[in-house]
Swiss-Prot record:
The RNAP catalytic core consists of 2 alpha, 1 beta, 1 beta' and 1 omega subunit. When a sigma factor is associated with the core the holoenzyme is formed, which can initiate transcription. The keyword Lyase does not apply. It comes from Syntrophobacter fumaroxidans (strain DSM 10017 / MPOB). This is DNA-directed RNA polymerase subunit omega. Gene3D superfamilies: 3.90.940.10. Pfam families: RNA_pol_Rpb6 (PF01192). It comes from the Bacteria.
Length: 121
């Protein structure tokens, strides 16, 4: 189905009122992690309407769909998080290897705002 229309959805439900309630409920399910019943290429609202137009979401099965288990996190998100964790670990490892005592003497030479700068160089 290239384009979903209200007319397509109304072939599957008895009224616009029912369609709105069914679509809202399905969108909330999708946002809560419910598995999609059709190809995922659109936002939740369009996806819900596509599912209704395809006859996969009905007044009779909407409650059963709420009980379906949520999908695991999308692989792309999980991979990005793994890369971020790895980068953070590398940064932390490098930070713990860094010899902070090398610059300790320089850190002690903090110039107080009220004090005059020394003539040492």
């Amino acid at each position: 189905m290239a384009r979903v229309t209200i007319e397509d959805c109304l072939k599957e439900v008895d009224s616009r009122f029912t369609l709105v309630h069914l679509a809202v409920r399905r969108v909330l399910q999708l946002r809560g992690g419910a598995p999609p019943l059709t190809e995922v290429r659109n936002k939740e609202v369009v996806l819900a309407l596509r599912e209704i137009a395809a006859g996969k979401v009905t007044v009779d099965n909407i409650r059963r769909l709420e009980e379906a288990k949520a999908l695991p996190e999308p692989v792309a998100v999980t991979q990005k998080e793994d890369v971020a964790r790895l980068e953070l670990k590398e940064i932390m490892d490098e930070a713990t290897l860094y010899d902070a005592s090398m610059e300790f003497d320089e850190a002690q030479q903090v110039v107080e705002p009220d004090a005059e700068p020394s003539e040492e160089g």
